[in-house]
Amino acid sequence: MHKKIFLLPLLLLLSCNALWAQLFVITVQNKSALPFTDQLIEVPWLPLQQMLSADGNLSFKIINATTKQELAWQLEYIGQTTIQNLLVQVSVPANASLKLWGIKGIPKKIAAKTDCRYVPQRKDDFAWENDKIAFRMYGKALQGTNEDAYGIDVWVKRTHSLLLAERYKKNDYHIDHGNGLDYYHVGHTLGAGNIAPFVEDSIWYPGNYTEYKILDNGPLRSTFELRYVPWNVNGKMVSVIKIISLDAGSQLNFVKANYQLQGGATFFPVVVGIIKRNEPGSIFFNEGKGIIGYWEPEDKKNGTTGVGIVVASGKNMLLQKSQILLQASLDGGAINYYTGAAWSKAKEVANSESWFRYLQQFQQKKSTPLIVKLQKGSSR
């Protein structure tokens, strides 16, 4: 009888150790004075796969080592046939660290927070969204029509749910039914942060995209590729491939534009731009940090949209009658930048001050990113 009593605590301890046996450990360090909230971290898959192989490639869950709360994650392929990264959504306070455990078990199902899709029934739209905001680009079917537009279109939202599939199915875009709408006008401009060559003081717009490829599609990150046929830029033919990613929890997209210029040149000036309305709005710029923010004039019915761009290689701001431009340089024919939007009616970014602060803090976080380390589990 006494032996059973003494053995019980030992059995409980052993069962707890088995429950939390770690296949791997991820340490996330935040050296910034800013908190990171709902941020995606990337863990290279190959070393992680080797750790899992030792345990027979069992399915796994990821938990907060302190709270034991299960975290959402995604396997990222980036268009490849094999896994490239493990993506995990984390929140880390300023000047703090976080430890995650990978443990055996079947992960909980999570609702998708991002989506991207080709929409042939709407004249080749390519649309994408997350739990904050939505966007679309126009395809070749719209080119040359009176609906044609060169830039990125914004679809504002005030719901964390995905809505594009439902709204496209209903052919209903321009009325707010309580969850958002597309009231943003693009026209023959760069819209909400598109990019184009800038030669002889002129923007040389490409046509609309002609090919697409979905590289990943949720639940935490959606990535896709848009291709454009070559077009004339001051007497030379130029082509571009754009890769666009949108993470859950972010107001901004990541854009990588790869240009090819006739003759093999890899340097020519480009601009990233935002359409400017005729009525007064608020403009913020920091050329040294490569930030431009625009808080549009209020629409009495639909509220206010804020648009912003962050370009590490940005150098000169150009203010035109209808556009705000940030001139940038290519690195080997490529450029990376961020662009996105927010809506006052979503009540997360309510005014110009909060939008411009968001953009500045976004740039600061990219300058001091989270440090991610992967280790083998300490117990089996």
What are these regions (language model features)?
Residues 23, 27-29, 50, 56, ...:
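Polysaccharide-binding surfaces and accessory modules of carbohydrate-active proteins
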Residues 24-30, 132, 242, 253-261:
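Short, well-ordered beta-strand segments enriched in hydrophobic/aromatic residues
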Residues 240, 252-285:
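Acidic (Asp/Glu-rich), glycine- and aromatic
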Residues 85-87, 309-380:
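Beta-strand-rich recognition/accessory modules
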Residues 22-116:
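Alpha-mannosidase-like glycoside hydrolase catalytic domains involved in N-glycan trimming
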Residues 105-203:
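Solvent-exposed N-terminal domain segments of exported/luminal and surface proteins
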Residues 1-25:
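Bacterial Sec-dependent N-terminal signal peptides
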Residues 170-247:
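Extended, loop-rich substrate-binding clefts of extracytoplasmic carbohydrate-active enzymes
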